[in-house]
Amino acid sequence: MDCGPPATLQPHLAGPPGTARRPVAVCQQESLSFVELPPSRLCVDLFPIAPEELQAPGSRWSLATPAPLQGLLWPTSPGGPDTHIASTSGGMRPGRAGSWPHCPGAQPPTLVEPWSSQHMQPQRRASHSGSEKSAWRKMQVYHNEEATGTETPTGLLETGQAAQEQALCALEPGPQELSGNARGGLEAPERRRFSASELMTRLHSSLRLGRSTATRVLTSGSGAGAIREGKLPVRESRRAETRADSVSLPGPVDLNEVHGGLVEPRLDTQDKPTQDPSSATERRQSRFLLNSVLYQEYSDVASARELRRQQREEEGPGDGAEGAEEGPGPPRANLSPSSSFRAQRSTRGSTFSLWQDIPDVRGSGVLATLSLRDCKLQEAKFELITSEASYIHSLSVAVGHFLGSVELSECLGTQDKQWLFSKLPEVKSTSERFLHDLEQRLEADVLRFSVCDVVLHHCPAFRRVYLPYVTNQAYQERTYQRLLLENPKFPGILARLEESPVCQRLPLTSFLILPFQRVTRLKMLVENILKRTAPGSQDEDMATKAFSALKELVQECNASVQSMKRTEELIHLSKKIHFEGKIFPLISQARWLVRHGELVELAPLPAAPPAKLKLSSKAVYLHLFNDCLLLSRRKELGKFAVFVHANMAELQVRDLSLKLQGIPGHVFLLRLLHGQRARHQLLLRARTESEKQRWISALRPSSPQEDKEITCDGEDRPQVQCVRTYKALQPDELTLEKTDILAVKTRTSDGWLEGVRLADGEKGWVPQAHVVEISSLSARLRNLREYKRVSNASSKLGDPPA
């Protein structure tokens, strides 16, 4: 049935030249208010039709309702065509400007039968109470549009009408949901509301049917040709997919799942008996992923928050005092987003940055009953989920924007591409499954959810993808540097990709190191959860198991990276070091380089009189390994000739702190023993104080028990916290991340210190410019308590202390 205007009216309906066609009705509100429209003539500017054609009974522009259209564009009243729905009293609710086409001096066109006198007054539906109105604003009704296929337009509209009427009946509230003073006479107005909504939907549907019919006629030839060539019309297929995804009629909406006006996906609807778990994870849309920030930004914000926590301790005792976390939670004002790190994030941040910001949590009243420790425990769990979403966001950018770049793929060879990106897609898939399980756990019980068992369950999968990726880090770095130097197209293509707002102008290297950063951060997040669990509880046991599994994974990753670097370094040195005497087997899996460098050997001149000491200086090069020391002289072409070597047990070092008479510089004495006697004795001079202390510390290493005493028993021992990341340049240095806390062991006057990291017990040298002193005694004591808390929990499982 042709419902459109005659062909002669098409130029008039198209509007003046140069103007775009606009839809008949547009609404962007969450809730609509439909008002009865007074009778009037059709706007002659919009419909230039002869008056006799409007009065003709059979004309398509007659004001009377055509019989074929009754019940199609709007349902027929049960009492016949003249039956009207009674309206309630009340003033007119102003509509939105531009909702209907209008012209000066004319009312909106009449779309229904001739009006009776009772419709002359403005009418509206009755108002609901605040709760019902808020609930109805969160519900949206969609109409099933299936305008493709071989069905006739009439059949399609009848099918859509039946499906929509069923959905509307299911969504219509019962009388018990309305307030008592508005129950009487509200059944008909509510039916009136949905009739108006149904009217607008079907008007849009009829317009789309006309356009889709014309489109099918115009594109039938080209579409058939594309199919014969084995190609699908991409534009039409995407349009069909969009309609199929956005127009399907939803079932009854559970208002308990609505957060902030958005309907959240339910996990139970994703579980089907014949559904593959991986496909369910891919089809399920994360509630945090779409609006999450990049992981690089999250790391900066989280580090700044931890630094502010230490600064608050500097200003005065806070919640770190003993027993402070057992009291009631902070006041409501302190739980607002403005006092959290969400105020520091960008506008593209995640929907809820804090667990306490979730509407279900705020509305439950549980915040008033939880202690400060319990609040921090839930926030630590929630941060693990939101940070994982941020991590996947960055991985998606790395895989989609960089790895998926056609231009970059054409520039790189297959082997270079494999070495540069390694197993990054597999890491992303594993993290997506992990986030899927975490969100299911959160949605199951948002008030008392747990995550450590989920972490423990995924640790084997983490090991399968993280260990190969981190092990490949050395090849990855070398491949990146080689491509910059040898591939002329690579720097330009990479620069264009890095300038894109998709990656927020961050370099590719910041994305490639994310897996190693994440596995370390994941251990830290689980450690924060463990610190706040009740001692002896089941939660503590599960958190300890998850922490131990992640700690073991991090240790394996570090050992794998160090093993490759150490082996390559030994192979490189074996080609340069030559022994004058017997052959020394340098390459060994149990050996690694600790420190190397050149010092000045001082020796008295034989002809010098004893009263006037004169010293000769000679350069000597030291290669210190974990089990032996090699002393050599430099030769041509960068080679070394070893003249003496000794085991670590045969070394004795002494710091000559007081300057010897006539011997300037930073001097220390090195003895190579043979039994109880000194086989060789060398007076060595370093260039700086820190160089001398670093050599003394390396030649006389402390035992693990001594390092443990520094971290556990030294309540008055100084502590520092990293404020700037530092990458170790020498084997005896320590790589630092922001917020790392060190117990200071040795300081030098030229700006270096040796410390032991509380988190893992690693020891090394770092520049003082990258750390700040923790002067607050309460903050230092709290750091030691947290360290002992984790160590005691780990010892219950038989693991070595963290």
Curated annotation (Swiss-Prot):
SH3 domain boundaries: 715-776
Chain segments carrying region Disordered: 1-21, 77-136, 173-192, 218-286, 307-343
Tissue specificity statement from the Swiss-Prot or TrEMBL entry: Highly expressed in intestine, and at lower levels in liver, heart and kidney.
A GO MF label: GTPase activator activity
UniProt keyword list: GTPase activation, Guanine-nucleotide releasing factor, SH3 domain
GO biological processes: regulation of actin cytoskeleton organization; wound healing
PROSITE patterns (alphabetical): DH_2 (PS50010), PH_DOMAIN (PS50003), SH3 (PS50002)
Function: Acts as a guanine nucleotide exchange factor (GEF) for RhoA GTPase.
Organism encoding this protein: Mus musculus
Annotated S-S bridges: none
Superkingdom of this protein's organism: Eukaryota
InterPro entries assigned to the protein according to its UniProt record, in alphabetical order: DBL_dom_sf, DH_dom, Ephexin-like, PH-like_dom_sf, PH_domain, PH_ephexin, SH3-like_dom_sf, SH3_domain
Ranges of residues in domain DH: 376-560
Protein name: Rho guanine nucleotide exchange factor 19
Limits of the PH domain: 592-704
Gene from which this protein is expressed: Arhgef19
Biased composition (Basic and acidic residues): 228-244, 265-274
